[in-house]
UniProtKB/Swiss-Prot annotation:
Site (Required for Cu(2+) reduction) location in chain: M170
Residues holding Cu(2+) 1: H147, H151, Y168
Domain E1 intervals: 28-189
Pfam families: APP_amyloid, APP_Cu_bd, APP_E2, APP_N, Beta-APP, Kunitz_BPTI
Region (Interaction with PSEN1): 695-722
Positions bound to Zn(2+) 1: E183, C186, C187
Induction and repression of expression: Phosphorylation of mature, glycosylated APP occurs 48-72 hours after treatment of neuronal cells with nerve growth factor which correlates with the timing of neurite outgrowth.
Organism per entry: Rattus norvegicus (Rat)
Topology versus the membrane: Single-pass type I membrane protein
Source domain of life: Eukaryota
Post-translational modification: Proteolytically processed under normal cellular conditions. Cleavage either by alpha-secretase, beta-secretase or theta-secretase leads to generation and extracellular release of soluble APP peptides, S-APP-alpha and S-APP-beta, and the retention of corresponding membrane-anchored C-terminal fragments, C80, C83 and C99. Subsequent processing of C80 and C83 by gamma-secretase yields P3 peptides. This is the major secretory pathway and is non-amyloidogenic.
Protein name stated in the entry: Amyloid-beta precursor protein
Amino acid sequence: MLPSLALLLLAAWTVRALEVPTDGNAGLLAEPQIAMFCGKLNMHMNVQNGKWESDPSGTKTCIGTKEGILQYCQEVYPELQITNVVEANQPVTIQNWCKRGRKQCKTHTHIVIPYRCLVGEFVSDALLVPDKCKFLHQERMDVCETHLHWHTVAKETCSEKSTNLHDYGMLLPCGIDKFRGVEFVCCPLAEESDSIDSADAEEDDSDVWWGGADTDYADGGEDKVVEVAEEEEVADVEEEEAEDDEDVEDGDEVEEEAEEPYEEATERTTSIATTTTTTTESVEEVVREVCSEQAETGPCRAMISRWYFDVTEGKCAPFFYGGCGGNRNNFDTEEYCMAVCGSVSSQSLLKTTSEPLPQDPVKLPTTAASTPDAVDKYLETPGDENEHAHFQKAKERLEAKHRERMSQVMREWEEAERQAKNLPKADKKAVIQHFQEKVESLEQEAANERQQLVETHMARVEAMLNDRRRLALENYITALQAVPPRPHHVFNMLKKYVRAEQKDRQHTLKHFEHVRMVDPKKAAQIRSQVMTHLRVIYERMNQSLSLLYNVPAVAEEIQDEVDELLQKEQNYSDDVLANMISEPRISYGNDALMPSLTETKTTVELLPVNGEFSLDDLQPWHPFGVDSVPANTENEVEPVDARPAADRGLTTRPGSGLTNIKTEEISEVKMDAEFGHDSGFEVRHQKLVFFAEDVGSNKGAIIGLMVGGVVIATVIVITLVMLKKKQYTSIHHGVVEVDAAVTPEERHLSKMQQNGYENPTYKFFEQMQN
């Protein structure tokens, strides 16, 4: 009985220990996580059985943005309240990766860093603090950085204290995978090294491994590397053979694999650097890549005699190694160097090194050069109707390439820190500074590429919108010029033109919102241009609508439809203006080529500007009535200007008919010189307030109010003074007037009597008489 009870208690304790110790994941066997490997279907953790499963839809592959990762977490875990994501601290080995269109696969194994899907309110991780270790934390409320930044901060802090980073976790979330602090545990070097198994320490003794095969040829591991590479190659061959067998069984899948998109092949190729499998390189290619690298001393200043393979000479040559960083063309002895690189033909090495090699100690992934650059490919391809889809693909490839480069740099950083453990503190700081500069340069390069991508996309969208608007306006004018004009055809052309103008306005506002979020200073500079463009749209639409009055018969017949159209557009303008500040986050992938606002409900925000705002400035027209058109018995229509009175100086060629109308004349609108300086907009409390432009008409009322205010203030002051004076005069203490001719003794006696003094003699005689 007792052994059975002990087994039950042990099983219950084991299940309890497997549960994730977070409030949001209470009762779950595993923590919600997702993993991505470009070219393969995404994987997610089954929280009920703790196993990795493929994408349920069978279509989702690697995601390029943090917003997309959060959305995918919410899709695969609909029963959980996923509020944020964070990159995991440690990589995991996941099997059974599948390509698109396959539900079950085997022998596909990759090592990746997953993303944790955080449930409910954020709760910091519970870190274990071993003996002789210290728990530390850092918070900065003015900083909102990624998981990678805070990991670097924790490592630097522990390194300054001559300790190793044992574990860490994020604090104070401020965005998607962004935080304001970090908690971490630093352990002494001796304690950390004792707690790690010696076999594991030879492979990787750092706290975080960023994936990838960390091959060190300088440590005499040639046989191990070649053996591992051969095993991987055999596994890949078997994997491809198994897939070929499956393809033979299903002819449709053969066609699908043969017609695999170029983009998917590119993503699969560029993901090699983040895994431990060599899916496209043979052992010879790996060795050729190593032996073709130039000798790198590294950022440290040690003088260690090493050997490297010289491509031009075809033999190994000595050089001095600094002790950290560098590359893999680094061998202890000449014999070992020749054993690795001597078997590779010099012609293949010269072919590999025909292009200039980077001089930087941090070697970026070489697989990116095998495919065209994502941004360059997008920029070289002319725009078409699928501009938005091409832009989204280019953006995802750019983010994937940036993540790949950052992962490679972090692996190099880890390797350099392992090698620099026994070096002086100055050398350690030099290593940290070098890689910090490298990370910053990669971030800046990615930011420049993003900006170039966005600017090109915006320019193409604007050109396409201009073409659409021009074509719609020409069709509208042609319909008006038809003999006889068909009212319903005219209305359809007018509706298309209005939609084209609406797209232009939507594109302008979204572009300004993106610039405002990325670069507020630049947004302030282009603010007047944005307002001017909105004003141009307003003027252009008023002129186009005024043309309808030249054909009164058509205007009268379609008046109801036009009024309804104008009301819808006015409601659209009100919705846009009312929601300008309600949702400030807009990805730079949204643009005017996406579905209209009535379908997507995307909101924008305008910065407050100096000056006055008129609601009509963003409402492109005013409703009109055909009854206001005067009758003309001679069929000569006097056009009615539907624009505001202040803007009626623009000529519309009254009475000239529509035979000589040109689209360019409508598109070119004269703007007031003052509008560039005073944009005429003001936002208060998320509402738009109209101020009359003609302030002179209210000067009389203002002067009257000022005079009345002065009079009222004067009366109040006089009243207060009188009340104060009355208060002081009403207070008295029974003062009795004394004749000025009396003697000083009598005056003194009078004052004493006023204060209650009684002459004792008088009091004695009064008592005697009584």
